[in-house]
A protein has these predicted regions:
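Carbohydrate-interacting regions of secretory-pathway proteins
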Residues: 1-201
Length: 201
C-alpha cells in the first residue's frame, strides 16, 4: 500500500487470518544492520523478529507442527503505547515499542503515536545487539552470556513457563549463530517501508 508492506488486521489475534501469518525473509542473517520505518494502527501490536529458527515439534496428536517464530527469536516490539494494554504489562515498560519484548525496556521511550511513521534500527554483531528508535539508541544487550540466561529466566520465556522457548532463545541463532528476520502478524493493521539490510562482516 503506497510503497509499504501492510498487514491487514484480522482483529482476532496473532496470525489468525486465513490469508495472514508472519512474513519471514527467505534466508538467514548472521551479523547485520536492519533499518526500516513502521507505523501501527490505533491499539495495534506487531514486532520484528531476528535470529529466528524453523523449529518443528509434535502436537497432541503426534503430528509435526511448525512452531511460531517468537519461540526462537528475540523481538523488537512494535506497539501503540498509548492504547494497547501490553504497554502496561511486563516489567519497567519492557513491552513498549522498540523494547526487547518482555526482557529489556527501550530507554528513552520516544515512539510516535499510532498512525505516524517511526524509524527502527536493529544491529546484530557477534552476539552484541542494539535497538534504535527514531534516531536514538534505546537498548543494547549481549547474547550467549550468563546475563542473557538470567534475563530469560526472569521473563515469560523462563525455563519453567516456556521450556522450549527458553532452550531456543538461550541458544539464539542455533549452532551457526544466524537466523531468519520476520515481521509479526498480531492481528492488527501495521505498515513497514524503506526496509534496508546491511551485512556486517
Amino acid at each position: 500500500e503506497d510503497g509499504s508492506i501492510k498487514f491487514n488486521g484480522s482483529g482476532i489475534g496473532e496470525a489468525q487470518n486465513s490469508d495472514g501469518g508472519d512474513l519471514i525473509f527467505a534466508h538467514k542473517f548472521k551479523n547485520f544492520e536492519l533499518e526500516l520505518e513502521w507505523k501501527i494502527s490505533k491499539g495495534g501490536n506487531s514486532g520484528i523478529f531476528y535470529l529466528g529458527q524453523e523449529v518443528t515439534s509434535k502436537d497432541k496428536d503426534g503430528n509435526d507442527r511448525l512452531e511460531m517464530l517468537f519461540m526462537s527469536a528475540p523481538e523488537y516490539q512494535i506497539l501503540d503505547n498509548a492504547v494497547h494494554p501490553d504497554a502496561q504489562l511486563g516489567k519497567s515498560n519492557n513491552r513498549q515499542s522498540a523494547s526487547l519484548y518482555d526482557l529489556i525496556p527501550a530507554i528513552p521511550q520516544n515512539a510516535k503515536p499510532a498512525g505516524e511513521w517511526n524509524k527502527a534500527k536493529i544491529m546484530v554483531y557477534k552476539g552484541t545487539v542494539a535497538h534504535g528508535q527514531n534516531d536514538e539508541n534505546v537498548l543494547e544487550y549481549h547474547l550467549w552470556t550468563r546475563e542473557w540466561t538470567d534475563l530469560l529466566q526472569s521473563s515469560k520465556f523462563s525455563e519453567q513457563e516456556r521450556p522450549l522457548a527458553f532452550q531456543l532463545l538461550n541458544n539464539c541463532g542455533g549452532d551457526n549463530r544466524e537466523g531468519f528476520i520476520g515481521f509479526q502478524d498480531h492481528g492488527d493493521d501495521v505498515w513497514y517501508r524503506n526496509i534496508r539490510i546491511k551485512i556486517l562482516d
